[in-house]
């Protein structure tokens, strides 16, 4: 801590893409008040943990880091300031202050504008002082703040915040409040600026983007997506996350009709059993989900689909689990985020249902789901061998500096020989091999698109 700048900050970001976007917002707010972003934690006199509360494992990771920072704070004789932001403080304020005395201040997702004031208050009050700003603000969308972005190639643009769905297992309504949408004009202005700055890819973000609605512009998400596509015609456009019950034919047609909107849809289903979906309060049946899949594939024949799955939810039987495996086989998702259920305090499931599936059985069922999905992914990816795909190069491959990795419009990862290319280039690659998670290929031409 001897060389750490007391006005320099470093942000550890956990969890979803929205948290990554929020870290950029916090960075902008702090820099506008004269604070300096440090390139590593050791140089920072202020350390922020931007946290996720969706799963117990994410909370545990934050706890481990706070223990590490406790030791560092002792060595600094209390000069290091530690703040916890994001979903965990909104959800577990008293637990944080009680169990982790290293924490000086807390800020929830709607109160990041208060960060400079919180820091000043703690600095002025001295050792042992704690501050918190955790009020929900149903109007806060951080419009007017230009986020600091870690990439000059790919950008996240939040278009709405919060969620009204109240799925039984989910903490998001408790941590991010009710839905509110960014004004259409503000979204389009940000998109145009990014396109003019040369960004190759823009991802529209929301806990449930399909619920987007700007009452002033009378604009729903399908209409916003079309407008974004036209505002940045040379830029790839993605969006996440969608709720199956809110996928409309108008939205699917918009994707099909605009060539720069990526042909990939992430559509979390969570279980293959309608009975379990009812307990989860998902608002749809498996039959209705499959109707949405059929609609998507009828209008976007080359679409790729991904999903989320939860193994071992309350009351899940072996028959329910087998229904999940059958759904995977029927839909043929490209990929899936797969977890076993862990109850989150204050959620409907934790308060009203019994967590009656033994942990060992949860883990066994999860492993079966993973193995099933890996087989499907490997089969789908092997079918791409011999084809030519357009790839946006994103970064150096983890395994070799002589290779780059990038993604197709369908969100498939491709690793290929560098051949003079660099991140940000768009090129055609012939697929020569595959694994269950990656396509392997060779660039076709020596000039970028």
UniProtKB/Swiss-Prot annotation:
Binds 2 [4Fe-4S] clusters. One cluster is coordinated with 3 cysteines and an exchangeable S-adenosyl-L-methionine. Its EC number is 2.8.4.3. GO terms for molecular function: 4 iron, 4 sulfur cluster binding; metal ion binding; N6-isopentenyladenosine methylthiotransferase activity. [4Fe-4S] cluster 2 binds at residues 163, 167, 170. Catalyzes the methylthiolation of N6-(dimethylallyl)adenosine (i(6)A), leading to the formation of 2-methylthio-N6-(dimethylallyl)adenosine (ms(2)i(6)A) at position 37 in tRNAs that read codons beginning with uridine. Signal peptide: none annotated. This is tRNA-2-methylthio-N(6)-dimethylallyladenosine synthase. It is found in: Cytoplasm. SMART domains: Elp3 (SM00729). It comes from Chlorobium chlorochromatii (strain CaD3). Monomer.
